[in-house]
Structure formats: structure tokens, C-alpha cells
Amino acid sequence: MAQLLMVTVTFGCISLLYLLPGTLSGSLGKGLRPREPPAKIPSSGPQPGHPSLRPVVWKPPHALQPQGRGNPALATVHLPQGGGSRHPGPQRHVGSRRPHAQLLRVGCVLGTCQVQNLSHRLWQLVRPSGRRDSAPVDPSSPHSYG
């Protein structure tokens, strides 16, 4: 029985890994496609009508520190030269508009959705079927639905 379960789980894992995008098993003999287009090399000067851009400092939203403690250089937003800003001077991070942001579902981070989906699918395949995984019904118990 244990060998049958092991074979089933192994086959399920291999099947799910084969279906994942980006695995080499489905693209043998084909050229690998880059995930991002290559960066364009700018010409020897700024294009007419395109202001030259200053570097943009980006920090993930979950890594921002409370107001007043962070590095002001990281909180500064750099805009295109040429008067594209509504307010003169550096702009500060005002803080989160949602006071309970930790209660919100944040979604996928670094591809963990695929891991969660695979884990859930494996659990569905391996879990005991029927009512064996639920509590037994006891009609005399006040906590039972029976």
C-alpha cells in the first residue's frame, strides 16, 4: 500500500512539474525564449521630445519603514527633468493609506503561488477520501451535528 501511495505521489509530482511553464521538458529542441525583452541601447543623445530621466529609486511596499525613520534618499521620487513635477522639491513617502495592511492578502511573492497550488493539489490527491478525515458523529455529544 505504501509503495502504491509513493508511486501515485511521484507520478503526480512529475505530472504537475511537466505542466509548469518554463520547464525544459516541454521545450526540448526549441530555442529558449527570454522572459524580458533585452534593454534598448539609447542613441548618442536624448531623443527630441523625450526629456532625459534621472535614476528612479524603487523599494518594495512591504519594506518601507514608518514615516520619519527611513533614509530620505530612498523615499525621494525622481521625476523627468523639465518641470514634470507638480510640487517643487523632493516628495516624501506619506505612509500607508490602509492602517491594517497586514490583514490584507498580498498575493504571490517570488512565485510562491505555484508552490502553494502544487502543495494544495498534492494534498487533494493524497488526502484520505470520504469522511475518514472528519470527526466521528456522536449523537449524544453537544458538539456533534448528529
UniProtKB/Swiss-Prot annotation:
One Gene Ontology term from the biological process aspect of the record: feeding behavior
Organ and tissue specificity: Expression was restricted to the intermediate and anterior lobes of the pituitary.
One of the record's GO molecular function terms: protein-containing complex binding
Spans traversing the lipid bilayer: none
Keywords of this entry: Amidation, Cleavage on pair of basic residues, Disulfide bond, Hormone, Secreted, Signal
Domain of life the protein comes from: Eukaryota
Chain positions of site Required for CALCRL receptor interaction: R105, T112, N117
Coiled coil: none
Subcellular location: Secreted
Major place of residence: secreted
Residue numbers of Tyrosine amide PTMs: Y145
Disulfide feature: C108-C113
Keyword Iron: no
GO CC annotation: extracellular space
Task of the protein: Intermedin/ADM2 is a peptide hormone that plays a role as physiological regulator of gastrointestinal and cardiovascular bioactivities mediated by the CALCRL-RAMPs receptor complexes. Activates the cAMP-dependent pathway through interaction with CALCRL-RAMP3 receptor complex.
Name this polypeptide is given: Protein ADM2
Organism: Rattus norvegicus
